[in-house]
């Protein structure tokens, strides 16, 4: 940042703004929504007839951020309904879904039910939580850029971020970008929808599963039961990941993947 001349950060995420203001207050920031509100002839590509605005918890004490979003919504023809309570957690925060799924579900349902109107949000996590609850919901940027009413998997979001970085590096700096290469990248996973959704709920991405299988294969670790189902583990910091899988000619079929906040060490006798 200093080498680049201490530029202003343009932020679309209230959490990013909150963390930067706390930890690196010397960085000047401006919300993307304020800048967009100054652009002429904005295109409305995916509007609702009416909507309620849901403020993320990180914007609870950020009057400027909330106001920028409301002014931009008005540019799109909205006078969004205000919810009776603002700035409450949608359920995503604190890894609640992994630590206490029942509490997460209860909170997400309660927040989704605060209004019968569709929600207009400006937090990617809020968007995902409400779409998974079947609540009509759009990020305010979708009104400008077009919408896709689905929740993407972790590995899809990671791949998209790499594509965005590659495009920006080429367009803004005329430099190539080569994503990091891992020894397990060539592993092919076969994952049923239900298993993939269970992995998502536990914040386990495909790369972690690939690494776990690769380490077990290279180190000769893991277990195999009488039915040919393999069990392998991967230790990272305070987390231990477990993967059950079978080998097929087409790739590794994942039976299940789970994790816990526990490490274990092998002790030589």
Where are these regions (language model features)?
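Iron-sulfur cluster-binding electron-transfer modules in prokaryotic oxidoreductases
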Residues: 1-183
